[in-house]
């Protein structure tokens, strides 16, 4: 991805080292289908990462953390704590990703990989994906799709930044993941939108 406003020199190895510091070990050979329980933590810890720039491949995709992460949205008008959630009634390509009250369920957990992928815990082998048909324009759908190690499935959440960026539609840091501000409760659409520094574009990622 073109990095015109921040350094492009963050390597996959650096990202691994940073993320591992949160939990002590990285699980290089873990199989998402073999996981049967979400490990509990005593206190949530924030997680930040820089994905490899577009066109820079990682040596071997692997998970950065042993346990899945939880992604919360800090929309100022939210009625309660809200999480990034995949529709549990779906699971196929194109399944909706939405905002929902945090409830500790598997559809609100994601495995972070060193290529920037966020794999659904509920639907192993499906990754958070920006719809190519939207072209990165305002309203581009965020969905799940077969994990395929492509830039539209590579995300970053740099330290000191509230936003989550997509590698395919980075736009010099001007396009970010956004929740529909017109829906304050469950079911708000998750999409790409021009960065506007408003709270619907503020996210926290937690290892807990």
Identify the meaning behind each predicted range.
Residues 1-32:
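Secretory targeting and sorting signals
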Residues 103-106, 148-151, 195-199:
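Short coil/turn segments at the loop-to-beta-strand junctions that recur within blades
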Residues 93-95, 137-140, 151, 186-188, ...:
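Residue-level signal for beta-strand positions within conserved beta-sheet cores that form or flank
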Residues 8, 14-17, 36-39, 98, ...:
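Intrinsically disordered, low-complexity repeat segments enriched in small/polar residues
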Residues 180-182, 191-197:
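Short, exposed beta-strand-loop hairpins at the edges of beta-sheets
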Residues 2, 29-91, 106-136, 154-184, ...:
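Extracellular glycan-recognition/adhesion modules and their associated mucin-like linkers
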Residues 95-101, 140-146, 188-194:
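Aromatic-rich beta-strand patches that line glycan-recognition/binding surfaces
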């Amino acid at each position: 991805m073109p990095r015109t406003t921040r350094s492009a020199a963050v390597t996959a190895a650096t990202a691994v080292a940073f993320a591992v510091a949160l939990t002590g070990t990285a699980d290089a050979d873990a199989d998402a289908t073999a996981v049967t329980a979400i490990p509990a933590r005593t206190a949530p810890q924030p997680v930040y990462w820089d994905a490899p720039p577009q066109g820079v491949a990682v040596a071997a995709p692997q998970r950065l953390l042993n346990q899945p992460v939880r992604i919360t949205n800090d929309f100022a008008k939210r009625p309660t704590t809200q999480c990034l959630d995949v529709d549990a009634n779906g699971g196929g390509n194109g399944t909706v990703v939405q905002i929902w009250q945090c409830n500790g369920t598997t559809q609100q957990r994601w495995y972070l990989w060193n290529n920037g992928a966020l794999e659904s815990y509920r639907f192993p082998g499906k990754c958070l994906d920006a719809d190519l048909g939207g072209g990165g324009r305002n309203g581009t759908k965020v969905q799940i799709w077969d994990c395929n190690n492509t830039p539209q499935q590579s995300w970053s959440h740099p330290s000191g930044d509230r936003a989550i960026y997509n590698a395919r539609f980075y736009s010099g840091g001007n396009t970010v993941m956004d929740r529909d501000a017109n829906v304050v409760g469950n079911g708000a659409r998750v999409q790409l939108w021009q960065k506007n520094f408003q709270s619907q574009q503020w996210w926290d990622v937690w290892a807990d």
